[in-house]
Regions:
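Long, charged, mostly alpha-helical binding arms that flank functional sites
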Residues: 275-354, 358
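Secondary-structure transition/capping motifs at alpha-helix termini
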Residues: 43-46, 75-83, 107-116, 139, ...
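Short, Lys/Arg-enriched N-terminal segments with co-localized hydrophobic residues
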Residues: 3-18
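Substrate/cofactor-recognition hotspot
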Residues: 333-634
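Conserved short loop/turn motifs at secondary-structure junctions
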Residues: 55-58, 87-95, 117-127, 150, ...
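A glycine-rich helix N-cap at a beta->alpha junction
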Residues: 100-126, 132-135, 140-143
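Active-site cores that bind ATP or allylic diphosphates and position pyrophosphate for catalysis
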Residues: 90-92, 135-296, 355, 364, ...
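N-terminal catalytic cores of NTP/NDP-binding nucleotidyl/phosphoryl-transfer enzymes
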Residues: 28-105, 221-253
């Protein structure tokens, strides 16, 4: 899988405990679900066992919301010395594929979790589920309804009116068993009969008004082929799957709140005694500017708005992997968002913050110029080239490593770092002004060369040879520091800058047909003439970098390998919600992400002058709203 370990740059190593079944409990969290688990363990409710499960339906790719569920279920099992099952809820033959089975496993392993020997499929329980249904029929608690589906829906009533009993509700157990068996044998067409629970047509919970347990569907199942033509529905099957596997805590998102009553009814009446599984609901994750619904992503793929399920603008885990998001960042996001009973939309900036927190401590720094303009240093010896020793990490990152950066009389700088008519507060290169080239020299702008249309062709400067390494011996102050790339030595790359795919902060609330109307036309910018220092050519292709003063990048694992250089921006460098320099205390980060780092292994050369990266001198003050958000998050997390 891409984005894994490499010897060329510092990486976060997955904790060994995340890749095997835990041997004992660690320090549990304090959210309401963990409080329930703690109490159950203390009372030996399940003999002290803790068994959770992550039960995706293999009908699509996992998204960031699923990552929260994975972290919660596997995390609780790990904290309490239990186990977490991976179970595919594959009871729908129409939509499920082995392709999704494989991608889900890849996503879970990428996040740093492992189900070990506990991989299960609901389709393996079909016979046992059928036998449980027969138990309900024999007890007079389930019946075969021969009404059309529309009549069944209308007969359920409304939230203010009771339902109407089916004319087939009082069939004898013998007749129901006969019809149920003939349904399994394939005697009837799709939709001709259903099996319903016989509960309460006047229940205030409409899910308890004789819910459908089985339907007829003549379709080939991706695992079972044509063995079955009747299939159980979620509310009947899910609780049984938990009971068969002796799950202790069945954790669902809030939309299944009303299903809990039916969950308990099925298990109790089939004959599972206490202590049996119980369902607990949490709010889940709703990420702004993102569509998490598979049903709504599919039309975008079909219409060619995005090319498949892994384009980096999507919120699927396979898309995050391709973009270069480290899995530790999603684990940290899970901690930042937390577990609650009330839902709230999570700002996309919080995910960006989590990504920066991880990459700031691991990504080697290199120089790149996205929108280049040429600078000619007129008093630099013609044909000369020299090298500067540049560290990969700033002083506040506890990693070592450096590389050599070539310098020549012609260099590239960012077009935005030069201004003929600078605004107030501009601290970069201006006519007659000086600027510091990172690690190199101080230069002064002497002349601007333009073409006939007034576009700048090059900027001619002179350098102060006494300022090697960036320091001024006479103590004069230089406005700012900018990155650069040597013209004859730099490599050309394509860079892809991603923004939110949707303009609306809540696109998941839109109808599927209207989703396309909310696409951000500027969500993808492709720059084909980016210049990067040549040191990147010696690194492994899955190295994540900080392009200084720009953002975090890595090579696209599909379009970028080999001779072609294609870099994806993982996240911009600017923090839109946290105060500069503010971070979670090291102990908090260590607890939340279980990370350790390995130093960059590039050879370190001796040099007469070693330069540390100073703070970004171009960063401005963050806006008051961002500061307020950061302070709120700090309070929520309980950190100083």
């Amino acid at each position: 899988m891409s984005g894994g370990r490499h010897s060329g740059a510092a990486v976060f190593l997955l904790p060994s405990s995340a890749m095997s079944e835990p041997k004992g409990p660690s320090s549990p969290g304090t959210d309401f679900i963990r409080q329930v688990v703690t109490a159950d363990v203390a009372s030996a409710r399940h003999g002290g066992r803790v068994v959770t499960r992550f039960p995706p339906e293999p009908n699509g790719y996992l998204h960031v919301g699923h990552a929260m569920g994975i972290c919660l279920n596997f995390g609780i099992a790990q904290e309490f010395g239990g186990r977490c099952h991976l179970r595919y809820d594959d009871t729908n033959p129409d939509t499920e594929k082995n392709e999704y089975v494989q991608s889900i496993q890849e996503d879970i392993l990428w996040l740093g979790f492992d189900w070990g020997q506990h991989l299960y499929f609901a389709s393996d329980y079909f016979e046992r589920m059928y036998e449980c249904a027969e138990v309900l029929v024999k007890k007079g608690l389930a019946y075969v309804d021969s009404q059309p589906n529309e009549a069944i829906r209308e007969g359920r009533g409304t939230v203010t009116e009771s339902g109407v009993a089916s004319p087939f509700r009082d069939r004898s157990a013998e007749e129901n068993l006969d019809l149920f068996g003939r349904r399994r044998a394939g005697e009837f067409e799709d939709g001709e009969h259903v099996l319903r629970g016989k509960i309460d047509m006047a229940s205030p919970n409409m899910l308890m008004r004789d819910p459908v347990f089985y339907r007829i569907r003549h379709a080939s199942h991706y695992r079972r082929g044509d063995d079955w033509c009747i299939y159980p529905l979620y509310d009947y099957a899910h609780c049984l799957e938990d009971a068969f596997e002796e799950v202790t805590h069945s954790i669902c998102t809030l939309e299944f709140d009303n299903n809990r009553e039916l969950y308990d009814w099925v298990l109790e009446n089939v004959g599972f005694e206490e202590p049996r599984p119980h369902q607990y609901e949490w709010a889940g994750l709703d990420l702004e500017n993102a569509v998490l619904s598979k049903r709504k992503i599919a039309p975008l793929v079909e219409a060619g708005v995005v090319s498949g399920w892994d384009p980096p603008r999507l919120a699927t885990l396979t898309a995050y992997r391709r973009r270069g998001v480290p899995p530790e960042a999603l684990r940290l996001l899970s901690e930042l968002v937390g577990i609650s009973k009330t839902g709230a939309q999570t700002e996309a900036a919080k995910l960006d913050y989590a990504i920066r927190q991880v990459l700031n401590q691991s990504a080697p720094r290199v120089m790149a110029v996205l929108d280049p303009i040429k600078v000619v240093i007129t008093n630099y010896p013609s044909g000369k080239a020299e090298e500067f020793e540049a560290p990969y990490y700033p002083h506040d990152v506890p990693l070592e490593g450096s590389r050599t950066v070539p310098f020549s009389e012609e260099i590239w700088i960012e077009r935005a770092d030069f201004s003929e008519h600078p605004p107030k507060g501009f601290r970069r290169l201006v006519p007659g002004g000086e600027v510091r080239l990172r690690y190199a020299y101080v230069i002064r702008c002497d002349e601007v060369i333009k073409d006939d249309t007034g576009d700048i062709l090059e900027v001619r400067c002179s350098y102060d040879s006494r300022t090697r390494g960036g320091s001024t011996s006479d103590g004069r102050k230089v406005g700012g520091t900018i990155q650069w790339v040597s013209v004859p030595h730099g490599v050309t790359a394509e860079v892809r800058l991603f923004d939110h795919l949707f303009l609306d902060e809540g696109p998941d609330g839109q109808d599927s047909g209207a989703i396309g109307d909310h696409i951000n036309p500027d969500s993808l910018t492709i720059i084909t003439s980016t210049k990067i220092e040549p040191s990147v050519l010696a690194d492994q292709e899955d190295t994540r970098y900080q392009f200084e003063r720009t953002g975090y990048f890595w090579r696209d694992p599909i379009d970028g390998p080999g001779d072609r250089l294609v870099f994806n921006r993982i996240v911009p460098l600017k923090d839109t919600w946290g105060k500069r320099g503010t971070s979670l205390p090291p102990t908090k980060v260590e607890i939340q992400t279980s990370l350790r780092v390995e130093a960059h292994s590039a050879p370190k050369r001796e040099a007469s002058q070693q330069t540390r990266i100073p703070p970004d001198e171009q960063a401005g003050e963050r806006d008051a709203e961002a500061v307020a958000r950061m302070e709120r998050y700090t309070r929520e997390l309980g950190v100083g």
